[in-house]
């Protein structure tokens, strides 16, 4: 009976396929056919009664199966089955599990298979807890480590088996079975393996394409405040694809804050983003930028950048310290190199990063006289440690500034435009040429360009360009600031102070769509 049962199932399925009628909706006219298409389940249930099966079991099975089909179908099926004599169905003899008359002949074993079969038996007896797959891997590794003399007995045994096989099956041809078409699960698995090796660029492009506002791909990255209505947060620039967590959510987890309602995420903390991953390939693929506006962040070939003309406070060009009110004076020292950029004056001690914006304070907070910069000994990595200009000597922060060697013409040209050439003692840097220009007063005397004291307040976006006291030169942000990030490096201002910075287009924000 066990032999016949699978065969009956198979013939039923074949006839189902031939008749083309799906089993739950058996048509009435199939009643004339000897083996009705819709009765797959019932035919199997009635057959065991012929085969001296105890009657209770098929009946139980039948009852559970009957729930699947409507009453009319069941009646039609039983009508057909009543008049059919199952003894007339021819039963072909099945040999070795294949429907062909001749049994399937296996290939003779090769040397490795001889070794693996013998070794697997031995190991499986000794270590019954070993998983079969692990066992196979181990056997493969061991086989590769064997030398010729150790392999010889297995090779000889394999040769003997091959000769024997040829005697037994003289007309044997190796006919590998056709592979079945790839199942969905397998395809998904393959896709998954492909996706584990996706470059960050591809992820970035996909993020851009998926986002509903992808008309301005990069803009979204820098302006999370706009997307308050979105269910998922704005796409963030890719970190390396080691984790599947969306980078924005990972930041939230690190900061330990719950996600606010409405899917609105706090601004991205760029300390955790490796901007070096945003390679030039990615940046060249973003066609939605206003190129002219973007150019103001790029270091020009020896000429000062064009100052921006927004109503809001911007850095004119890039690192130059000047508010838009003082643009004519400020335009000269716009592209100060990073070595020359003055270190930030320390914020007043009473102010926490999250503090609300303070009104401009009285001038005592501002430095009274232009202090002398004291050059510290240069660090071995060419990252200079400058002591900050501060009226309170106790508050000396050390600022590490990565240097990029810019052309000497860059320095000298930018010095020609400086309004006041009052030179302090030049930096004594052994690894730079004597053409390194003296530091001019105009770059240090903040009170020339600022409303007095207003650059201390963290949210003084309206009053000054010292965006939270020049904090994007902080040691916390500098290490990731790779040269490629000159094009996209402006985002490395820490957005931990208050999300309201995002409401107005400060200099990090590019075009509004």
Curated annotation (Swiss-Prot):
Pfam family, one: HMG_box
Keyword Transmembrane helix appears in the UniProt entry: no
Segments of this protein annotated with the region Disordered: 1-67, 160-273, 334-447, 483-513
Intrachain S-S bonds: none
Record-annotated DNA-binding residue ranges: 105-173
Region annotation PQA: where it falls in the sequence: 63-103
Protein name (record): Transcription factor SOX-9
Function: Transcription factor that plays a key role in chondrocytes differentiation and skeletal development. Specifically binds the 5'-ACAAAG-3' DNA motif present in enhancers and super-enhancers and promotes expression of genes important for chondrogenesis, including cartilage matrix protein-coding genes COL2A1, COL4A2, COL9A1, COL11A2 and ACAN, SOX5 and SOX6. Also binds to some promoter regions. Plays a central role in successive steps of chondrocyte differentiation.
GO cellular component, one term: nucleus
Subcellular location, record wording: Nucleus
């Amino acid at each position: 009976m066990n032999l016949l049962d699978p065969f009956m199932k198979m013939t039923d399925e074949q006839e189902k396929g031939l008749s083309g009628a799906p089993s739950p909706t058996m048509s009435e006219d199939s009643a004339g056919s000897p083996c009705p298409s819709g009765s797959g389940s019932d035919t199997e249930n009635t057959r065991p009664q012929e085969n001296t099966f105890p009657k209770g079991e098929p009946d139980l099975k039948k009852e559970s199966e009957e729930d699947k089909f409507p009453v009319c179908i069941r009646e039609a099926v039983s009508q057909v089955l009543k008049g059919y004599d199952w003894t007339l169905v021819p039963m072909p003899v099945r040999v070795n599990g294949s429907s062909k008359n001749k049994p399937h002949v296996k290939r003779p074993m090769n040397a490795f298979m001889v070794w693996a079969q013998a070794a697997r038996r031995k190991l499986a007896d000794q270590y019954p807890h070993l998983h079969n797959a692990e066992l196979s891997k181990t056997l493969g590794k061991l086989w590769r480590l064997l030398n010729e003399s150790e392999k010889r007995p297995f090779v000889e045994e394999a040769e003997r088996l091959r000769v024997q096989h040829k005697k037994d099956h003289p007309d044997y041809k190796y006919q590998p079975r056709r592979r079945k078409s790839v199942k969905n699960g397998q395809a998904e698995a393959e896709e998954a393996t492909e996706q584990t090796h996706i470059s960050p660029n591809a992820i970035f492009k996909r993020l851009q394409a998926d986002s509903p506002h992808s008309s301005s791909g990069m803009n979204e990255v820098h302006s999370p405040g706009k997307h308050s209505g979105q269910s998922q947060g704005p796409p963030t620039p890719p970190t390396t694809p080691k984790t599947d967590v969306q980078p924005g959510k990972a930041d939230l987890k690190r900061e330990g804050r719950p996600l606010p309602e409405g899917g609105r995420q706090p601004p991205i903390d760029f300390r955790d983003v490796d901007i070096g991953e945003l390679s030039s390939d990615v940046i060249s693929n973003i066609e939605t930028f206003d190129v002219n506006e973007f150019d103001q962040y790029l270091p020009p070939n020896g000429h000062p950048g064009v100052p921006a003309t927004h109503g809001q406070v911007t850095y004119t060009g890039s690192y130059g310290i000047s508010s838009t009110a003082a643009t004519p004076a400020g335009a000269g020292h716009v592209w100060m190199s990073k070595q020359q950029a003055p270190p930030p004056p320390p914020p007043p001690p009473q102010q926490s990063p999250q503090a609300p914006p303070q009104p401009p304070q009285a001038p005592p907070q501002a430095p009274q006289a232009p202090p002398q910069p004291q050059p510290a000994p240069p660090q071995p990595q060419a990252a200079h440690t400058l002591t900050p200009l501060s009226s309170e000597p106790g508050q000396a922060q050390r600022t590490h500034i990565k240097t990029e060697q810019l052309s000497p013409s860059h320095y000298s040209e930018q010095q020609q435009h400086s309004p006041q050439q009052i030179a302090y003692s030049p930096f004594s840097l052994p690894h730079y040429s004597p053409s390194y220009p003296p530091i001019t007063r105009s770059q240090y005397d903040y009170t020339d360009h600022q409303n007095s004291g207003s650059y201390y307040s963290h949210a003084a976006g309206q009053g000054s360009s010292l965006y939270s006291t020049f904090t994007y030169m902080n040691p916390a942000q500098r290490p990731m600031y790779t040269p490629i990030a000159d094009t996209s490096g402006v985002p490395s201002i820490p957005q931990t102070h208050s999300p309201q910075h995002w409401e107005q287009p400060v200099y990090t924000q590019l075009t509004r769509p």
